[in-house]
Amino acid sequence: MNGGIDLQGSFIDTLKDLGLPPGVAKVIWMPLPMILMIIGATVGVLVVVWLERKISAAAQQRIGPEYAGPLGVLQPVADGLKLVFKEDVVPAKADPWLFTLGPVLVVLPVFVSYLIVPFGQNLVITDLNVGIFLWISLSSIAPIGLLMSGYASNNKYSLLGGLRAAAQSISYEIPLALSVLAIAMMSNSLSTIDIVDQQSGYGILGWNIWRQPVGFLIFWIAALAECERLPFDLPEAEEEIVAGYQTEYAGMKFGLFYVGSYVNLVLSALVFAVLYLGGWEFPVPLDSLAGWLGVSPDSAWLQVITASLGITMMLLKAYFLIFIAVLLRWTVPRVRIDQLLDLGWKFLLPVSLVNLLLTAALKLAFPVAFGG
């Protein structure tokens, strides 16, 4: 297997060749992955917002954004600037500390979760042995922020919206975790790198989506509910309880909720690609293709091509899933709160438990195919 390109080693060696001490070179490298991660996630959100507006406009036979830049590509930037310069209003009877902390608790864990998303063999900020467990743990913090925002607003509609959001997130967190546990059982690891490696070698035929068809459906439904996407956007739907926990928010605090929702959608799509679609792996194994062409897997230019294709494949898979999520917005009607909770507790939870037990049985019966 191609070991991948070592960006950290190449960067530090380049700085050492320029005369910098090794310690200084490492200090310069340390913040760069985090900065790239924040910039990449922000740009990804801007692209998703623009795509959703254009796709939604096409579904309604409209033009969509077209004046802010060519084809309206700068419309999300204009929206962000508008929110930045709006007045930040705090209700007179609200708790100012909790009111401010709520949006931060919603957004910050999502950005931190990008630490474990791999775009290649060595293209990951932190390859933890419990990477997927860390993602699930961080996603469990968001309901606290939502409930805090609803409570701190001192508004009955905000409080009810916050309670609904917390109940929805908790209801779908358990089926999500159980579907991920089935993947971890097959991969014998919670590391995102190991999960992708377990799917490599056979191209598209080795992806987990074929061995976990029920698990991938559970994961995708639960991920949409976690991101509060239609048809699961009850906590913030205008037709429901005013605007939910966001009712009293304005300016950049409201913008944090807006950004957090889309950043979480992109993150969920990337994690889905890692768990079920082979991550950065190409549908045809590149190592086998290089062997057929007589190219050495250790050649530098092949490593660069492999890394570039890996990043491209991850983004293509993620944005295809986001495209599906946007289409669902204009296809599936919004469910009622009782239907939403029944789906999570009475259907997805027992099905995810059965799927986990079935995966364990298949692993014992067919260890080669199911990672015994």
From Swiss-Prot:
It is a multi-pass membrane protein. It is found in: Cellular thylakoid membrane. Keywords: Membrane, NAD, NADP, Plastoquinone, Quinone, Thylakoid, Translocase, Transmembrane, Transmembrane helix. The chain crosses the membrane at residues 31-51, 97-117, 130-150, 176-196, 204-224, 254-274, 308-328, 347-367. Its EC number is 7.1.1.-. Its main location: membrane. The keyword Nucleus does not apply. The keyword Thylakoid applies. GO terms for cellular component: plasma membrane-derived thylakoid membrane. InterPro entries: NADH_UbQ_OxRdtase_su1/FPO, NADH_UbQ_OxRdtase_su1_CS. GO terms for biological process: aerobic respiration; photosynthesis, light reaction. PANTHER family: NADH DEHYDROGENASE SUBUNIT 1, NADH-UBIQUINONE OXIDOREDUCTASE CHAIN 1. HAMAP family: NDH1_NuoH. NDH-1 is composed of at least 11 different subunits. Belongs to the complex I subunit 1 family. NDH-1 shuttles electrons from an unknown electron donor, via FMN and iron-sulfur (Fe-S) centers, to quinones in the respiratory and/or the photosynthetic chain. The immediate electron acceptor for the enzyme in this species is believed to be plastoquinone. Couples the redox reaction to proton translocation, and thus conserves the redox energy in a proton gradient. NCBIfam families: PRK06076.1-2, PRK06076.1-5. This is NAD(P)H-quinone oxidoreductase subunit 1. It comes from Gloeothece citriformis (strain PCC 7424) (Cyanothece sp. (strain PCC 7424)). The lineage of its organism: Bacteria, Bacillati, Cyanobacteriota, Cyanophyceae, Oscillatoriophycideae. The gene is ndhA.
